[in-house]
């Protein structure tokens, strides 16, 4: 979600007032230390004046001057940025535990049950327990396999709905974003909650309209991505000058009501089923764990259920659909890629059925398209910020405890040191390559690495690969009339996820046998 103009205006107005009061000269780095190189900060605002609407690009330009390890200040907080695979390895692998903490923000406090989720939780016993729970209970290979039918059913529904939209468009362009979000949200909702709460049931009504759920997700990404003055200039925290904290509290109450509804419904089903109860979704799994008082209490279950909501429904739905929209954008700009993908799909799958998950290992070019999209358009260009838990040093430079650490994976993915012609979309670069997206290859980190790596990456990767494969297999693709490949707008909009600024529209026509779409 883009930072709004009025938010920046209010922020700058506050800064101007403070500068007028203080009338101090520009600051400089403290003497007698070995901090990494970087631009001199201004009083109060630090280097925030150098950060534009696309921070990953602004910071990339600064790193060209100051190097792959750079010191900045955001307000009163020291920030270190790593912009190379070597720095990524240092922060995320070699010294992972040193930099495994998170900064304390108003959004983390008010939108995640006081830092109870895996994303914003400090590195403590709660985080380690939740992380272990994700790995062993929620995202085990067996658990993901048990949800495979859900993924296939929702992808089939996507093909059917997109075919109907194409028929209704009569050769005109079809907006894709809504279809992609509905598909990913349907998968994640059913896996986590057991059903699509934004979908009406027979004889009843939806717990939340799809547009309301979408709005709640947008609000989450806005509030977790804005420049909140109080986070960086603590003097103004209590004033809530921009009104963000008030909105965070309102969001929290709305999410809490929805979450209570989900928990009550699941608990009632357990009560009715009695001994015949069988867990069918991740909330059920969490509630079963709560039966053992030595493992989880209700408050912890509630917090961890919100983890599933916000890090899977909120995060998974949005990040997966954003990645797919970028992938399809690049394919439309590169017809030779579309041609190669079509040949591979026709050879492996044929034209009388949809692509199944079992087909993916036999579709290396499709896998390469997804990797290349993640290289050029990582959904979180600088990952979530890390925080140094203790003093550290790298390449002769000191990083004091309490320093906020950013890893610019967008810059690493565009670095000619690691990639030939990095600005070109070339899936072929991954054909025969062992480079993967699972956090072991520092040149390609769409999900991060180490202890803070996205816990749901395996599910997200399955969803993206399956849907991209079926989109390319099920339809012919073209740009809207009058739009050339060079004219397709590829501008970004920054936030917790960095999406296309303008939603993708394409001319689509079903090309498989009719029964596939029925």
Where are these regions (language model features)?
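Cytochrome P450 substrate-recognition site 1
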Residues: 30-48, 57-150, 176, 180, ...
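Cytochrome P450 heme-thiolate "Cys pocket" and heme-binding signature region
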Residues: 395, 432-464, 489-494
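Terminal signal-anchor or tail-anchor transmembrane helices
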Residues: 1-30, 462
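Conserved cytochrome P450 K-helix/beta-meander segment immediately N-terminal to the heme-binding cysteine loop
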Residues: 360, 391, 407-435
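Cytochrome P450 heme-thiolate monooxygenase catalytic core
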Residues: 103-111, 145-324, 340, 357-358
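Cytochrome P450 heme-binding "Cys pocket" and the immediately downstream C-terminal segment
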Residues: 100, 335-337, 457-497
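Conserved cytochrome P450 K-helix E-x-x-R motif and the immediately C-terminal K′/meander segment
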Residues: 48-61, 65-67, 257, 356-396, ...
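C-terminal helix/juxtamembrane-tail motif
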Residues: 2-4, 496-518
């Amino acid at each position: 979600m883009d930072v709004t103009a009025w938010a920046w205006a209010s922020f700058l107005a506050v800064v101007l007032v403070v500068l007028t009061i203080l009338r101090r000269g520009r600051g400089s780095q403290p003497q007698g230390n070995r901090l990494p190189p970087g631009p001199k900060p201004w009083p109060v605002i630090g280097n925030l004046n150098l950060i534009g609407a696309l921070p990953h690009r602004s910071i990339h330009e600064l790193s060209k001057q100051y190097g792959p390890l750079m010191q900045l200040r955001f307000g009163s907080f020291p920030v270190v940025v790593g912009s190379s695979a070597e720095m990524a390895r240092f922060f995320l692998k070699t010294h992972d535990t040193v930099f495994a903490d998170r900064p304390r923000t108003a959004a983390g406090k008010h939108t995640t049950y006081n830092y109870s989720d895996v994303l914003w939780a400090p590195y403590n016993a709660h985080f380690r327990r939740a992380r272990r729970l994700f790995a062993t209970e929620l995202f085990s290979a067996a658990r993901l396999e048990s949800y495979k039918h859900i993924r296939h059913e929702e992808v089939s529904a996507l093909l059917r709905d997109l075919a109907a939209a194409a028929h209704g468009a009569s050769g005109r362009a079809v907006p894709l974003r809504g279809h992609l979000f509905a598909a990913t949200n349907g998968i994640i909702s059913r896996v986590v909650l057991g059903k699509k709460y934004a979908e009406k049931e027979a004889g009843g009504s939806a717990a939340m309209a799809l547009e309301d759920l979408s709005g709640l997700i947008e609000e989450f990404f806005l509030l977790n991505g804005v420049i909140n003055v109080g986070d960086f200039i603590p003097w103004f925290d209590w004033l809530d000058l921009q009104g963000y904290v008030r909105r965070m509290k309102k969001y929290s109450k709305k999410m809490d009501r929805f979450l209570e509804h989900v928990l009550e419904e699941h608990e009632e089903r357990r009560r009715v089923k009695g001994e015949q109860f069988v867990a069918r979704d991740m909330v059920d799994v969490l509630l079963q764990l709560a039966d053992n008082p030595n493992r989880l209490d209700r408050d912890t279950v509630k917090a961890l259920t919100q983890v599933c909501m916000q890090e899977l429904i909120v995060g998974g739905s949005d990040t997966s659909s954003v990645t797919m929209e970028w992938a399809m954008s690049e394919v439309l700009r590169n017809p030779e890629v579309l041609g190669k993908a079509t040949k591979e799909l026709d050879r492996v799958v044929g034209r009388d059925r949809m692509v199944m998950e079992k087909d993916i290992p036999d579709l290396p070019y499709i896998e390469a398209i997804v990797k290349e999209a993640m290289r050029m358009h990582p959904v979180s260009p600088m990952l979530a910020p890390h925080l140094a838990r203790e003093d550290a040093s790298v390449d002769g430079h000191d990083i004091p405890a309490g320093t906020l650490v950013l890893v610019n994976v967008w810059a690493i993915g565009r670095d000619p040191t690691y990639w030939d012609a990095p600005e070109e979309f070339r899936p072929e670069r991954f054909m025969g390559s062992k480079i993967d997206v699972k956090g072991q290859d520092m040149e390609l980190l769409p999900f991060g690495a180490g202890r803070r790596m996205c816990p749901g990456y395996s599910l997200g990767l399955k969803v993206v690969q399956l849907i991209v494969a079926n989109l390319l297999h099920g339809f012919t693709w073209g740009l809207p009339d009058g739009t050339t490949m060079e004219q397709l707008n590829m501008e970004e909009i920054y936030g917790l996820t960095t999406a296309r600024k303008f939603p993708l529209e394409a001319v689509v026509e079903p090309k498989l046998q009719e029964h596939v779409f029925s």
